[in-house]
Amino acid sequence: MEKTAAPRTLLPGDWAVLALLAEQPAHGFALAQVLAEDGEVGQVWTMPRPRVYRAIEDLRSAGLIETVETTPSDRGPARTLLAATPAGAVAVEQWLARPVAHVRDARSELLLKLVLTHRAGRDLRPLAAAQHGVLEQLADRLTAQLETADGQRALVLRFRLAQTLAARDYVADLLR
């Protein structure tokens, strides 16, 4: 019987592990290689091997991944092949489609979502369009606030607006 616990809020690294397992079954060691600093996904989101295994245990406890098979190994412990459960696959699809709410998350979480979506061979445009809308609204709010700001507040708002416009332009390029 699979044990489940009330799912805690998943961190981007947990989502990365879940997305990779929704893409195809894998062993923990293979996941750690993809998420290593020089790995395909690690270029965007790096996770040390112990953190990958911790994410695996947390995702398994939440009922989002399961063991597909376990095979003995000549070297070290048995190899456990893992995959996303149906609930895990649905959760990761929803997460991948959801734009980030803050510009500060564009460099990390948004880029991670884009890389994982691309890696899975899916169209980036739905996420890019949703993210463009969020960033456009944020840019409008910051522009309105900047009209009445002065001093230090204006300095900060100009920086935030520049960052927002750069992120907006980046996702707009993905829509072309």
What are these regions (language model features)?
Residues 51, 109, 155-159, 163:
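Amphipathic alpha-helical interaction segments
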Residues 23, 54, 130, 159-166:
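DHp/HisKA dimerization-phosphoacceptor four-helix bundle of two-component histidine kinases
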Residues 125, 132, 136-139, 146, ...:
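Heptad-repeat amphipathic alpha-helical coiled-coil interaction surface used
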